[in-house]
């Protein structure tokens, strides 16, 4: 099986090691850019464990694993089924459909194995030290194996995954290159996938260029939406520059999903979920942990109404909602470092295909 390994590797090295990425997290500098309605902060440092330093070989391997259905019981489902670049590194569904699903990735997919939550985007997970809506994983390496073992997702035990990969000579070579002297292990599967996920960065959105002095990077309408976003206190949870935070908040009516409480057993966490990033949010709907908001307008209006009901803000008019949405759509969209979809994978299996394309 042939695939553009060199092209993939080159693209990923640029994504992981460019000066743009390396310049983040180096400490605060005096802000002298155009007006912004909050205190300026630089990007934080990438969270990278000492035992898994990022390399181009790991990222290249992780990308192939991410798109290869070899890591699923049905040999048709991949990580990219629920985290596709077409759908903002999510899947366009309210809740995901894992193994035994039929149809394209995204709307139109059907199947018996529904997850209980909306697929969170993997944009900028490199900056997180807790993963999933409930924060149950303390590292990307721990997170990477959970879908593998979950019956409604990939449903493949780690030992079977190792054996399947070991039967493909190209994967043997790729693991030897990425992990010399170690080979194919469960831990190295997780490390390769984590390295790939750390390369999926949004750090060059129009908002970023605006703060660097390009006043024309965002429109006047987007600037008005940015001010409304700040006036409503939205930045208190969706804090720039990542437009997210490590907070867990209960904003929606609590159903059967108790959220963070299941992890901490603390009643104060009842119905609380981690604040998601708003970068590339244009493409990652439906929204909220349960996918109950079909579009951004609904999500923004719902959040504003909740804030108003709690005395933390006010409801927004339709025109104001539209301006906030323009800010989110136009100022925070940045796909320059999304993973390159390979043309084929070493297993020879069919990469999950998207039957629908969202507007670019």
Could you say what each language-model-derived stretch is?
Residues 1-7:
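Bacterial N-terminal signal peptides that target proteins for export
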Residues 14-16:
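C-terminal motif of bacterial Sec signal peptides marking the signal peptidase cleavage site
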Residues 5, 18-360:
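Periplasmic c-type cytochrome electron-transfer domains
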